[in-house]
UniProtKB/Swiss-Prot annotation:
This is Thiopurine S-methyltransferase. The lineage of its organism: Bacteria, Pseudomonadati, Pseudomonadota, Gammaproteobacteria, Legionellales. Keywords: Cytoplasm, Methyltransferase, S-adenosyl-L-methionine, Transferase. It comes from Legionella pneumophila (strain Lens). Belongs to the class I-like SAM-binding methyltransferase superfamily. TPMT family. One of its GO terms (molecular function) is thiopurine S-methyltransferase activity. S-adenosyl-L-methionine binds at W12, L47, E68, R125.
Amino acid sequence: MNKGQYFWNELWCEGRISFHKKEVNPDLIAYVSSLNIPAKGRVLVPLCGKSVDMLWLVRQGYHVVGIELVEKAILQFVQEHQITVRENTIGQAKQYFTDNLNLWVTDIFALNSALIEPVDAIYDRAALVALPKKLRPAYVDICLKWLKPGGSILLKTLQYNQEKVQGPPYSVSPEEIALSYQQCAKIKLLKSQKRIQEPNDHLFNFGISEVNDSVWCIRKG
C-alpha cells in the first residue's frame, strides 16, 4: 500500500470523511441535463466513496459505474441503502453489482481498463480535486479512454491559496482544466462562485479566506 492509499484508508477507518455529503449534490441536479445522457445510459463516478449521488443517478434510470479505492466505503454504501448486491473478484479488483449499479473496489490506476465498458458520461464531483497534481494527467487520460466519443463530463473543481494548505481537496485552476482537456471538443464553464463559509469546511478552518467553486461540462470529440 502506497502513501496515498494508506491516507484514504485511514480516513475511512477513522470516520474522518467530512467530504462525504448526505444530500444529493445540487449541482448534479441542476446540470445533469447538460450531459445529454441517453435513456439507460452508463455513467461513471470515479473515486465514488459512498456518494448518494450514485443512487440519485440510478433513480433517473441510468446505469452507474463506481470506482473506489476503499472497500469500507462501498460496504457502507450498500448497507446504508439496503442494496442487495452480487459479488465478484477479478484479479486485484472486487466487484459489487446489481442490474443497474456496478461498483469496483480497486486503485483506479491499477484497474484493468478492459473491465470498464465505454460510458456515456462521467460525473466527477470530488475525484480530480482529490488527486495531487502529478497524478491528475494520468487520471484524465484514463477517464477519457472510458468515455464514448461525444460523451460528456460534469466536473466540479475549486480554487484557493495553496500556500496555506496543500489539500486534498486540491486547488485546480481554469488554466489546468483547459490544458488537461485540450483534446476534447468543448470545455464549458457552467458555474463559478465564491463559497459561503461553513463551520465544518476544513479549508476555512485552516485559514483559507476565499474559495471559488466551479462546475464544468466537457464534451469529448
